[in-house]
Amino acid sequence: MYKLIHSIAERSHATAVKRGQDVSTFGCIAALRTEQQEYWQAVDKGAEVADIRVLSAEANKLPDAEFTALYEAKIHNTASDELADILITAATWLHTAETGGGEDFDPDRSIDVMLLSGAVQFVCNRITGNADVERVQLVTNMKLRFNELREG
């Protein structure tokens, strides 16, 4: 999971900055609070995507405007979407910590990494098998594209 968030950290951070979001430690903590609440709301409503493989294959072939419309209609605000938001926020926070830590940044000695690992663990606790791993990866990749394409 850490490999995943590290691989998307710079991209997540750049997108958040472009969208005017607060990427500071406190901004990321506040965002995680919101995303966790939205996750539980989606779970309580039973909001989920039935076959993410099929939808992902279809969505990734679409031009940007059509992709955004499909994501908004079929994936946005589902439990998987909110888990992706949690991972993306953790990745954004990781990039903030890395850049703030300078050349000698050591994640093992970073309070930011220690704290953001709770968000990663929250997502990991929702994964019960390979299908969940694949779902998180597919939705996270689509969510990154969706975030890059939308305003604010």
Predicted ranges, named:
Residues 1-152:
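Flexible "arm" and connector segments at domain edges
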